[in-house]
Regions:
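Extracellular glycan-recognition/adhesion modules and their associated mucin-like linkers
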Residues: 2-32, 50-79, 97-105
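Surface-exposed turn/loop modules enriched in turn-prone residues
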Residues: 35-46, 82-91
């Protein structure tokens, strides 16, 4: 898989978001409700493990789940270490906006 600095994002494609251990982000138990947890899990080709990057303007992206159509969201709008990720219907809040930055390695 290409590094983030090598990937050109397309709003028409779905992507896996992989951790260094090879696990991917997914909606836990393919739950379609607001507040459903997002977790790391073994890749199995499921649509609840696939994500679409939606341009939010100003260099930010919303990350939408293929299966549920909901956005990756910071629980309770949290901004501190340890804040949980969950999914939520699209809002205008910054808790659903993400900036992507290339890494050096």
């Amino acid at each position: 898989m290409a590094k983030a600095s090598q990937v050109v994002l397309s709003e028409n494609e779905f992507y896996l978001i992989k951790a260094p251990n090879g696990k991917v982000l997914e909606v836990k138990n393919f739950n379609t409700e607001n507040g459903a947890a997002i977790r790391l899990w073994d890749y199995a080709g499921h649509p609840w493990q696939q994500w679409k990057f939606v341009d939010a303007g100003e260099g930010r992206w919303r990350i939408q789940n293929r299966f549920t159509g909901k956005m990756m969201d910071l629980a309770l709008g949290g901004v501190v270490e340890g804040t949980w990720l969950h999914q939520w219907g699209r809002t205008s809040g910054l808790s659903q906006c993400w900036a992507l930055e290339p890494t050096r390695n």
